[in-house]
Design a protein with these regions (language model features):
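Positively charged n-region of N-terminal signal peptides that target proteins for export
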Residues: 1-4
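Sec-dependent N-terminal signal peptides
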Residues: 6-11
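C-terminal motif of bacterial Sec signal peptides marking the signal peptidase cleavage site
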Residues: 14-17
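A short, charged
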Residues: 100-124
Length: 183
């Protein structure tokens, strides 16, 4: 009988000796504990959708999804004068909004595609379309976008958005389009 009581006491002592006095709190967050501050791990699950980040309320701006990318275009806004690549004042507020979103979301990358109307040589239009894309990139950077997250490409007169038979159509073809994606 004494052996049984002794065995039970030893077992109880062994169980209490193996228990920890630390409190475990489960499901408190993901990340590293540093003085009770948690760094949330940046996972796909907790990222906002691109549509919630890239938001415009200006007329003439269209945003559509193609696969994992957003395509932002401004078909109703005249972005560039004939044979010019200077960014027009009327579009600067929208571009500043885009730059702010890009600066605040470092994982977002953007490709700027520049276009021209069909007047001029193919080589000249290709060069002009690159200058237009670069002018937009430079403006975005000046307003807080991260330059290394922006690429540019010129397409000249390829892929017209409108007819080249009228001045109004040619004006809409002098444009850039933005392909926005997660990096």
């Amino acid at each position: 009988m004494k052996k049984k009581i002794f065995a039970v006491l030893m077992l109880a002592l062994l169980v209490t000796a193996c228990s920890s006095s630390k409190k475990v709190i489960k499901n408190t967050g993901v990340g590293v504990d540093s003085a009770n501050k948690y760094a949330i791990e940046d996972t796909e699950a907790n990222k906002k959708p691109l549509e919630d980040i890239i938001v415009f309320d200006q007329e003439g701006v269209t945003i559509r999804r193609e696969g994992n990318n957003l395509i932002l275009s401004m078909p109703e806004l005249i972005l560039f004068d004939f044979d010019k690549y200077a960014v027009k004042d009327g579009i600067k507020p929208s571009l500043a909004t885009l730059a702010k979103a890009l600066g605040e979301n470092k994982d977002i990358h953007i490709k700027i595609d520049g276009y021209t109307d069909f007047i001029g040589t193919e080589a000249y239009n290709l060069e002009l379309s690159v200058k237009r894309a670069r002018a937009i990139k430079d403006f975005l950077i000046s307003k807080g976008a991260i330059g290394s997250n922006i690429s540019i490409e010129g397409y000249g007169e390829q892929n017209p958005a409108d007819t080249n038979k009228t001045e109004a159509g040619r004006s809409r073809n002098r444009r850039v389009e933005f392909i926005i994606s997660r990096g």
